[in-house]
Design a protein with these regions (language model features):
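Nucleic-acid substrate recognition interfaces
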Residues: 1-211
């Protein structure tokens, strides 16, 4: 079976635009929630999840072959494509959850009419190579693509030595997921998730001994 573990690495205080990046991502999610709430009737008619996602992206992202119906690209220019797609996925999940709860309320299976809240606590994911780059082995740094208020740029980030030592000792050689930015107690962290394959004991439950 698979076991997923995660660990948050503290980002040392420095003059980098983490707050700007978090804010612009949440603003994008809020905007998209409104868009998908407005267009849910047509989106919900698409049964295949990937096709629904593609249509949701076509609604807001302009390409040579696609004219977007909504002005997301103008409001959030140059947003990295992976981050835009993460925002779309989060917004779709929020609207889908609301619609499910609304249907339960209408069927009298849920007390209290649910509300669709555009305010959110979504945190950006830093996809490897395009948003996140690891430093050389043994160094307590990384590079993140952050929003400085005008553009998306690469910034060096200093990470807490004790946290990095723990990862190197505990998870060396294991593949981590793309890190997610977190904020707790006025501090910022990069949270990494690791997946392990664990073999279950074949001994019958009644014969297992807990030491």
């Amino acid at each position: 079976m698979q076991i997923i573990s995660s660990y948050g690495v503290e980002i040392k205080k420095q003059n980098i635009p983490l707050r700007h990046t978090m804010d612009i991502f949440r603003q994008a999610v809020s905007y998209l929630i409104r868009v998908y709430a407005e267009t849910w009737e047509e989106l919900s008619g698409i049964g295949n999840a990937q096709k629904r996602f593609n249509e949701a992206e076509h609604l807001v992202h302009e390409t040579k072959k696609n004219h977007a119906r909504f002005d997301f690209d103008c409001r959030f220019p140059k947003m990295p494509s992976y981050l835009r797609r993460a925002a779309i996925q989060h917004a779709l999940g929020s609207v889908s959850s609301y619609q499910t709860r609304l249907a339960l309320w209408e069927g009298r299976e849920l007390s209290g009419k649910p509300k669709l809240t555009c305010e959110n606590h979504a945190m950006p994911v830093f996809y490897r190579d395009v948003m996140y780059k690891e430093a050389e082995t043994g160094e307590d740094t990384a590079h993140l693509k952050l929003f400085d208020g005008c553009d998306w740029k690469w910034f060096p980030v200093k990470l807490l030595h004790t946290d990095m030592e723990y990862l190197r000792k505990k998870w060396s050689g294991k593949k981590a997921s793309a890190p997610t930015l977190e904020k707790k107690h006025h501090k910022y962290f990069l949270r990494f998730s690791y997946t392990e394959e664990i073999s279950l004991s074949k001994t019958p439950v009644k014969e297992q001994v807990i030491c």
